[in-house]
Design a protein with these regions (language model features):
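N-terminal export leaders
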Residues: 5-11
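Low-complexity, intrinsically disordered terminal/linker segments enriched in charged
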Residues: 166-215
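Early exported N-terminus immediately downstream of N-terminal targeting peptides
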Residues: 31-112
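Surface-exposed, charged secondary-structure patches
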Residues: 96-98, 105-148, 200-215
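N-terminal secretory signal peptides that target proteins for export/translocation
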Residues: 1-3
Length: 215
């Protein structure tokens, strides 16, 4: 039986990741282009969440997130060793990407609402691979509450910079690997049935979308 992914489980996985943390390197070069990319896009995303019109807020936030993050690449990464099933079935691959993207964006919109209208300040960056793989560090100061430290792993491809992972908090714990492990645990339990995982995420996304939101 597939173990459902709750919103709390999703976010606890995001905040709980530590295995992929990248140790700071005081001698690593900075990348001003990647820093500017994060500054402008993170600022725009938080500004979108401040829109009082729920429909416009959701549409604008989704548009920005799909531009900001490499959702297709992240979606494939999330199923790990089960990704050959996606390569073999175009319909399954499309449905999985859509379901994962909708679930992830709905979760971020809900949980990051308290940061809406916050001020983003990029504080530095560290090149892991020169010109291609960069960790950008930032602080987010919400209208209410404490400043939050956020790190962004961005990769440069033919389409420019794209976010691949985010780390939240002073411990610089990353978001991607534990969520992948949770998905893989579900797939292991249901004999690799990606379609069952898709249906689970669709149900969870619908529940989040139907939850009354600020308007």
């Amino acid at each position: 039986m597939t173990r459902p992914v709750s919103r709390a489980t999703f976010l606890s996985g995001l905040i709980g990741l530590g295995a992929f943390a990248v140790a700071p390197n005081a001698h690593a070069a900075r990348n001003s282009d990647a820093e500017s990319y994060v500054q402008s896009n993170a600022t725009a995303a938080l500004a979108a969440l401040a829109d009082n019109n729920a429909t416009q807020r959701r549409q604008q936030f989704q548009r920005l997130m799909t531009q900001f993050a490499d959702m297709d690449r992240i979606a494939t990464y999330m199923v790990g060793r089960y990704s050959p099933a996606l390569r073999a079935d175009a319909d399954l691959r499309r449905d999985w990407r859509v379901a994962f993207q909708d679930f992830a964006i709905a979760t971020y919109e809900s949980q990051f609402q308290n940061l809406s209208g916050g001020i983003v300040r990029v504080t530095g960056s560290e090149e892991r691979v020169a010109g291609r793989d960069v960790i950008v560090t930032s602080e987010v100061r919400p209208p209410r509450g404490s400043t939050m430290q956020v790190r962004w792993r961005v990769l440069r491809s033919g389409e420019g910079w794209k976010v691949m992972d985010i780390a939240v908090g002073r411990d610089a714990v990353w978001l991607g690997q534990i969520q992948q492990r949770q998905f893989l645990a579900q797939l292991d339990e249901n004999n690799g049935n990606v379609r069952a995982l898709i249906n689970d995420l669709r149900g969870r996304t619908t529940a989040m979308r139907n939850t009354p939101a600020r308007s």
